[in-house]
A protein has these predicted regions:
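Beta1/beta-strand and adjacent pyrophosphate-binding region of the FAD-binding site
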Residues: 97-114, 268-278
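Short hydrophobic core segments
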Residues: 107-109, 213, 231-242, 274-275, ...
C-alpha cells in the first residue's frame, strides 16, 4: 500500500523536511510522518491510515509533487512481524482491545460538504474539532454526485459544442470520444478535490478519523472499524451523514443501476431507460444523449423536475425532444426483466394500459433516502422519521447539543444547503455579538436562508426564493416579469438563445421574492437571484444596479426593468 502526497496548493513542488518515522514504525491516523515546506509555509504531512511503514520513498531536502509516493506501508491485517495484527489488536478481526479517548468541542460525523465545511468553519472560529468519515472525504457530492456528474456533463457539453462548430465558422471533422479519458478526467478532478479538502482540514488542525461513528446517550461518540477504536467526549455533535439512492424492489435486476454505478461505468450503452424525471434523472438523460445513447425517461408524476417552475420545465422538455430524449409522464414502473441477451425490458402502466420498453440498461433515479442507522438513533434517544432525523428550528435534534444538517435531516437535499446549515449551527453554538452593546447573544435562533437551486440540464435551470405556484398557494399578490434570452446579446453570441429570466415581486413591498433562469449560464445567475432575495432588494434597487455588457446577467436587469417601466430590449 502507498501513501501519496496530496494536492499542493499553488501547483509548485514542496520540499521534504524532517522525516518523523522510520521503516518498521507503526503509525496511526493523525500522526505526523513528514514535515514539508510549500509556498504557503511549513506544513506537517499526517497519516490518514493505520499500518506499519515498510519503505520510505522520499529523502529530506528533495522536491515533492502532487501524487508522489512518500511511503509504503502494510495494513493491520498482515506482515508486521508479530501475529498479523497491529498494536493493541485483539484476537478477532474488527475488535479493538485499546480504546483511544479524546475530548473535543465539536465532533462532526460525515465528511461531505455539510460535514467538512462545518469542521473548517468551527476550527476557524477557534474550536477543537474532530471529523469522522467512514469512506472518503467529500461525501456523495464530491465522489458519487455533484462533482463527478458535472465533470462528465462538461465533457458532453464540449462534445456537443464541437458538433455545432460549423455554426461558428469552424470545421471540426472526425470528432471522436474516448470514454476512458473522459472518466479519467472525472476521476482526477475528484481525487484533486479530495486532496484539497484533506490539506485544508490538516492546515486547520482538524483531527480526522476514519471509521463508523455512533452517538451514545451521554453525547459520547464511539468510533469503530479503526485500530484503535475511539471514544470522543464532545461538547456538541453535528450529524452530517448525507443520503443514499433509493432502489425499489423491482430494481433488484442486474440490468438496473443507480447513480453511483452509472458514474463508475465507463461504457455508454446504446440505449438507456431512466426511471425518474427528477433532477438526477434528467441530468443523466442529457449526459447520455449527448454521447449518442438513445434515452427513454419514465416518470410517475404528471410533470418533470419536481417543483421546478413550469415555464422552465417546458424549455427543458423542448430541448429534450430536440435531442431525441423520449419522456413518458404519469407512468408507473411495475417490473423490470433481463433478457437472455442481457438487455432490459421495463414494464410500466400508463393511461390504464401496460406498456413495455426495451434498453441495454436501466438507471433508477427515483429519489434519495437519509443515511442513518435507525437502531443506533433509537438507542441514543434521537428522534427520526422516514424523511430523516427530526430537528427543531435550530437544527437541534431531540438530544440536546446534537444537531443534524444536510440530507440526513430531510429538509432540502442540496450540498450548499448542508454547508450553510453547518455554518449556522456553529454560529448558534458560539453565540453572536449584539451590534449595539457588543455583548454576546447566546443561542440565536437560526434564520432559514435563501437556498438557490441549479439543474445542469442543457440548457440549465437556476432558481431561488418562491415560485409562482408557491405564491398562489400562499395567497401572495405578486407581479411577474419575464425576459427572453432571444433578446440578449451574449446569448446570441454563444448560440444559446433558449429560455428566459423570470423575476417575482411582491406587489405591496415591491421586494423580489423569487426568480428563475432557464438558459445559458443559469447556474451562475442563480447566485445573482439569491443575492437579490436575501438582501430584500426591490425592483428599483435591482434595476439601478449596473450590469456589465455583453453578459447573460443583463437579462436579470431587464427583467427587473420589466417590473416597472418595461424591458429595454424586449417588447411583447
Amino acid at each position: 500500500m502507498e501513501i501519496k502526497m496530496g494536492l499542493i496548493m499553488g501547483g509548485k513542488p514542496a520540499v521534504a523536511g524532517t522525516i518523523e518515522v522510520r521503516a518498521g514504525d507503526w503509525v496511526e491516523p493523525g500522526q505526523t510522518l513528514l514535515n514539508t515546506e510549500t509556498g504557503k509555509g511549513n506544513r506537517p504531512f499526517k497519516s490518514m491510515v493505520s499500518g506499519r511503514i515498510t519503505r520510505i520513498c522520499v529523502e529530506e531536502g528533495s522536491q515533492i509533487r502532487t501524487g508522489d509516493v512518500l511511503f509504503e506501508y502494510e495494513e493491520a491485517d498482515g506482515g508486521n512481524g508479530t501475529d498479523g495484527r497491529g498494536p493493541g489488536s485483539a484476537g478477532h478481526a474488527g475488535v479493538c482491545r485499546d480504546i483511544k479517548r479524546m475530548d473535543t468541542d465539536v465532533a462532526v460525523i460525515g465528511g461531505g460538504p455539510g460535514g467538512y465545511v462545518t469542521a473548517l468553519y468551527a476550527a476557524g472560529r477557534g474550536l477543537r474539532v474532530v471529523l469522522i468519515e467512514k469512506d472518503q472525504l467529500g461525501g456523495t457530492c464530491l465522489n458519487r454526485g455533484c462533482i463527478p456528474t458535472k465533470a462528465l456533463l462538461q465533457s458532453a457539453h464540449l462534445y456537443d459544442a464541437l458538433r455545432r462548430a460549423g455554426e461558428f465558422g469552424i470545421s471540426a471533422d472526425r470528432i471522436r470520444v474516448d470514454m476512458d479519458k473522459v472518466f479519467d478526467r472525472k476521476d482526477r478532478i475528484c481525487r484533486e478535490n479530495r486532496s484539497g479538502i484533506s490539506f485544508l482540514l490538516d492546515s486547520s488542525h482538524v483531527t480526522v478519523i476514519t471509521g463508523t461513528a455512533q452517538v451514545l446517550p451521554d453525547r459520547t461518540v464511539a468510533v469503530k472499524d479503526g485500530n484503535p477504536g475511539y471514544e470522543i467526549k464532545a461538547g456538541h455533535v453535528v450529524l452530517a451523514t448525507g443520503s443514499r439512492p433509493v432502489m425499489p424492489d423491482w430494481a433488484r435486476s442486474p440490468v438496473c443501476m443507480d447513480s453511483r454505478e452509472a458514474l463508475d461505468s465507463r461504457a455508454i450503452p446504446h440505449s438507456l431507460i431512466i426511471v425518474g424525471a427528477g433532477v438526477i434523472g434528467m441530468e443523466f438523460a442529457f449526459l447520455y444523449a449527448a454521447f449518442g445513447c438513445r434515452v427513454h425517461v419514465i416518470e410517475y408524476m404528471d410533470h418533470m423536475l419536481g417543483n421546478t417552475d413550469a415555464q422552465a420545465c417546458a424549455v427543458i422538455a423542448e430541448a429534450a425532444r430536440e435531442k431525441g430524449i423520449r419522456i413518458d409522464l404519469s407512468s408507473r414502473v411495475t417490473r423490470v426483466l433481463g433478457t437472455d441477451s442481457g438487455e432490459a425490458v421495463v414494464f410500466y402502466e400508463k393511461d390504464g394500459a401496460e406498456h413495455a420498453a426495451n434498453a441495454q440498461k436501466v438507471l433508477v433515479a427515483v429519489g434519495r433516502a437519509p443515511e442513518m442507522d435507525r437502531e443506533a438513533l433509537e438507542l441514543a434517544g434521537i428522534g427520526f422519521d422516514k424523511k430523516g432525523i427530526k430537528t427543531d428550528e435550530n437544527l437541534e435534534t431531540s438530544m440536546k447539543g446534537v444537531y443534524a444538517i444536510g440530507d440526513v435531516n430531510g429538509r432540502i437535499q442540496l450540498a450548499h444547503a448542508a454547508s450553510a446549515q453547518g455554518i449556522q449551527v456553529i454560529d448558534r453554538i458560539l453565540g453572536q455579538k449584539d451590534r449595539e452593546t457588543g455583548g454576546m447573544i447566546k443561542s440565536p435562533v437560526i434564520r432559514e436562508p435563501v437556498i438557490p437551486s441549479v439543474i445542469f440540464t442543457s440548457p440549465e435551470i437556476g432558481s431561488a426564493g418562491k415560485s409562482e405556484e408557491q405564491c398562489r398557494q400562499e395567497n401572495i399578490k405578486v407581479k411577474v416579469s419575464v425576459f427572453p434570452f432571444t433578446a440578449n446579446g451574449k446569448a446570441k453570441i454563444q448560440g444559446e438563445t433558449e429560455g428566459f429570466v423570470k423575476l417575482i415581486m411582491e406587489e405591496q413591498s415591491r421586494r423580489i421574492i423569487g426568480g428563475v433562469a432557464a438558459g445559458p449560464d443559469a447556474s451562475a445567475l442563480a447566485g445573482c437571484l439569491a443575492v437579490a432575495i436575501t438582501n430584500n432588494l426591490t425592483d428599483d434597487g435591482l434595476s439601478k444596479t449596473v450590469f456589465a455588457h455583453p453578459t447573460t446577467s443583463e437579462a436579470v436587469w431587464e427583467a427587473a426593468m420589466g417590473l416597472s417601466t418595461g424591458c429595454i430590449h424586449y417588447h411583447e
